Regions:
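Helicase motor core with emphasis on the C-terminal RecA-like subdomain
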Residues: 1-130, 141, 166-170, 177
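Conserved phosphate/pyrophosphate-binding and hydrolysis machinery centered on Walker-type P-loop NTPases
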Residues: 8-12, 34, 38, 132-136, ...
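Short glycine-enriched loops at secondary-structure junctions
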Residues: 13, 108, 160, 216-217
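Short Gly/charged-rich anion-binding patches and loops
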Residues: 17, 43, 145, 209, ...
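Short helix-to-turn junction characteristic of helix-turn-helix DNA-binding domains
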Residues: 48, 150, 198-202
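Accessory DNA-binding and partner-docking regions appended to nucleic-acid-acting proteins
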Residues: 113, 124-128, 138-139, 156-158, ...
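C-terminal accessory regions
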Residues: 139-167
Length: 249
């Protein structure tokens, strides 16, 4: 449509791949991340700001101090690490007051990637050990709140306002959740089965193995480690694996 937009990715590799794919599809696109030279970053940024390129694909290194009021969409190709980052980046859409769109994609590996960044963050290397521990716990909690945002069925604007301490009980009517009718489903049986399975494993196995057990998998890992003797083995065999993954999240 010719609209200007920003696509945020977690890693340089994702930026390169998304930019490559869009360019092959004929889109006017450029990129921005810390792995590029200062000269290329500056050139790409100016090409986007002055309309020579329609789409900017970037890591969170892009955006500070950028004044481009006609950004019509902001897409998060990956979930950011906290609500603060998301709010700031999504807020770059529609600064001219015209209708704009923000889209957030999520998959479980985004949580793992962000957790890895938090665990191995070099920006806190100058802090003492006790302070680093406090900062890491804070960042992990913020990551949890960001993940909750991806799964909530409440008004997304309301969630953001409440997160930042501005209590709101009204619905915006614009977000996907406000425009979607949700059906409540009782998953007590599934949840309790998964919890009992984890207890029997002393919580020593990951999600994929737990799902394999309760679904009745016969992989070499399951049979070789006698995990088919778990009391919850195959209890949820009639559920689909994607559904069990969704519940376990």
């Amino acid at each position: 449509s010719g609209d200007s937009g920003i696509i945020y990715c977690l890693t340089r590799k994702s930026v390169e791949q998304v930019c490559y794919d869009l360019r092959n599809e004929g889109f006017s696109v450029t990129r921005y991340h810390a792995g590029l030279s200062d000269e290329e970053r500056k050139e790409n940024q100016e090409n986007f700001i002055y309309g020579k390129r329609q789409i900017m694909v970037a890591t969170n290194a892009f955006g500070m101090g950028i004044d481009k009021p006609d950004v019509r969409f902001v897409i998060h190709y990956n979930m950011p690490k906290n609500m603060e980052s998301y709010y700031q980046e999504a807020g770059r859409a529609g600064r001219d007051g015209e209708p704009s769109e923000c889209i957030l994609y999520y998959e479980p590996r985004d949580v793992r990637t962000n957790r890895l960044f938090i665990e191995n963050g070099e920006e806190n290397s100058e802090l003492d050990e006790e302070t680093r521990k406090i900062v890491k716990e804070r960042d992990l909690d913020r990551l949890k709140q960001m993940t909750f945002y991806c799964f909530t069925s409440e008004c997304l604007r309301q969630y953001i306002l409440n997160y930042f301490g501005e209590k709101s009980s009204s619905y915006c009517g614009n977000c996907l959740n406000c425009q979607t009718q949700f059906e409540e489903v009782d998953i007590t049986l599934e949840a309790n089965t998964i919890l009992r399975c984890l207890d029997a494993l002393d919580w020593n196995y990951g999600a994929a193995t737990v799902i394999d057990i309760v679904h009745g998998g016969k992989s070499q890992k399951i049979l070789g480690k006698n995990l088919d003797k778990n009391p919850e083995y195959a209890v949820l065999s009639e559920r689909t694996v994607p559904r069990l993954r969704q519940i376990l999240r």
